Regions:
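Multi-pass membrane catalytic core of lipid/isoprenoid biosynthesis enzymes
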Residues: 103-158, 162, 240-241, 246-248
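Membrane-proximal soluble regions of multi-pass membrane proteins
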Residues: 37-134
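Hydrophobic alpha-helical transmembrane segments
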Residues: 1-29, 35, 146, 150, ...
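Functional transmembrane core segments of multi-pass inner-membrane proteins
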Residues: 4-7, 19, 157-272, 309-313
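Interfacial loop-to-transmembrane junctions
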Residues: 239-243, 273-299
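Transmembrane alpha-helical segments of multi-pass membrane transport proteins and ion-pumping complexes
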Residues: 24, 28, 32, 147, ...
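Core segments of transmembrane alpha-helices
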Residues: 138-145, 187-194, 242-244, 289-295
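Membrane-water interface of transmembrane alpha-helices
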Residues: 28-44, 108-110, 222-231
Length: 313
């Protein structure tokens, strides 16, 4: 029985067609992650704020120079907690998917990756509002990523693992581009998964190099940011960028790869930042840096970290 299951996984699931199907399903889930994770992170922040406002001990630790929370602060905390409770649980699985325009629940047969979008003629079956092209675009992109690794690596467990790494980076890039947010849930999960994969011998580097890459990925941009803030009074990057590069370092291991990704990201982001500054002047807001880090990292993973390292060495 075990040999049959192993052969089924190798011949069917990990084949190129099987990985395409797996990628379409993964792309559908990735759309949920991209859409819901920022809201989940925002709800977490509101919940933490309400707990801080309603707990005198936590308030005194956070604001030692201020008096205990006033009646108005307590009332605001109660309002926040009430609003969160009234809206119900909000996770990757709850509530069920619904049309953002008419709030009509999406039936299971309307949620089949790519096919439902084509069958519904790109419109909601309830209100007729157009369904964004982003959803099938993500599904097709993820399917192509899974197919690429199935073709390049063959029917091995490493193929879906590295495809999942690319998908996580893709999700972080899209979220940061849309919301200027790199959720800790995703960056930290990617970081710890990279360290665990190295420790278990699943990655292309061992645990010591994975730890080195993660530390290098966090400390170098953090030191750049400290220097920029101190000498130029300008922030270089945010904490989410440090965590993202640390996660990339955990998977790639070699500091030279992490450094190359950072250099490419800086040189590609700089022209966009200068154009933004020229257009908007001093009022220009900082552009999200996550996509500039994620894009070269995805390219390195697609080509193969070992191959890129041999070129750079």
């Amino acid at each position: 029985m075990l040999s049959f299951l192993r052969e089924f996984v190798d011949v069917v699931v990990l084949s190129v067609p099987g990985m395409v199907v797996l990628g379409l399903i993964g792309g559908s889930f990735l759309n949920v992650v991209i859409h819901r994770t920022p809201t989940i992170a925002e709800r977490d922040q509101w919940e933490q704020a309400s707990l801080l406002m309603s707990d005198p001990q936590a308030w005194s630790l956070a604001f030692p120079d201020l008096a205990a929370p006033s009646v108005a602060v307590d009332a605001a905390a109660a309002d926040i907690q009430g609003a969160l409770a009234k809206s119900g649980p909000y996770t990757l699985s709850q509530p069920g998917s619904a049309c953002p325009k008419c709030s009509r629940r999406i039936r299971w047969y309307e949620n089949v990756p790519l096919l439902s979008w084509l069958w519904l003629r790109r419109r909601c079956s309830g209100c007729g509002s157009p369904i964004s092209w982003r959803y099938p675009a993500v599904e097709v992109t993820v399917a192509m990523i899974f197919a690429w690794f199935a073709w390049r690596l063959g029917p091995v467990p490493a193929a879906p693992m590295w495809a999942a790494v690319c998908c996580a980076l893709l999700a972080l890039a899209v979220i940061d581009a849309q919301t200027a947010l790199l959720p800790d849930r995703l960056t930290q999960a990617l970081l710890w998964a990279g360290l665990a994969a190295a420790a278990l011998g699943w990655s292309w580097v061992g645990a010591p190099l994975a730890v080195t890459g993660a530390a290098f990925g966090y400390l170098v941009p953090w030191l750049c940011d400290v220097a920029m803030r101190r000498y130029l009074a300008l922030p270089a990057m945010a904490a989410g960028d440090f965590q993202l590069l640390a996660a990339i370092g955990a998977w790639l291991g070699q500091p030279v790869l992490v450094a190359a990704i950072l250099v490419v990201a800086i040189f590609t982001a700089l022209p966009a930042a200068l154009l933004r500054l020229r257009r908007d002047g001093p009022a220009a807001s900082a552009a999200p840096f996550g996509p500039y880090l994620a894009a070269p990292a995805i390219l390195v993973v697609l080509v193969g970290p070992a191959a890129v390292y041999d070129v750079l060495r």
